[in-house]
Amino acid sequence: MFVVYAHRGASEYAPENTMSSFQLGVHMGANGIETDVRRTKDGVLVLFHDGDFKRVIGCEGCIADYTYEELMQFHVKNEKTDTKDIIVKFEDFLRYLGFRDLHFAIELKEDLAEETIALLDRYNMKDKAIITSFKFDYIKRVKELRPDWRIGYLVKEVTEEILSDLASIGGEQLCPQAKYVTAENVEAWHGMGYNVRAWGVANFDLMKNAYDCGVDGMTVNFPDQLISYMVKKQ
């Protein structure tokens, strides 16, 4: 099954990593959601991508500077909307969406394997979720804690070293940047037994190419456009 992962929700149209964005992605027909996990000053896991607040909140600071309650004063911005969306607690996300028939890609932005697995276990997410990161040590730690959990390695261009590292921990998903995806590479990666998910799909041409090359899933800010293209190709 091809998985359309709404990247931080339908983040082209709504403030990223907010309930509005996740809901819109599902409404558009995405069968997967991708999101990012960080930890607050008081140890609460929340969904936030950036290492600081400048881009999406518009001020100085970062998640680790504040308790969860203190974070409620901030609103996540998107230039296409004027909604006042708050930063989402990871557990609230799982409570609201975890029971749905969706795939979940949970990216570790910090070394949070143990805490993330504990919450996912609480909501019976093992068969629905894959834990991913650009940091190899983070996904390696997931496998050390729970070898039965699926992990994905987010990379730019795939190298022999990356393939060797992923194989060494029994990883399931290889996540190359879309601009490096070719049909030949996808075929080779499939031959190695990997599920292939493209990320960094910045425009329609990259989206079209990745889909046509045979990837198994894609992380996109505009799930409606990918779904429309898939329908046309059928």
Each language-model region and where it sits:
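Phosphate-group recognition and catalysis centered on beta-loop-alpha active-site segments
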Residues: M1-Q234
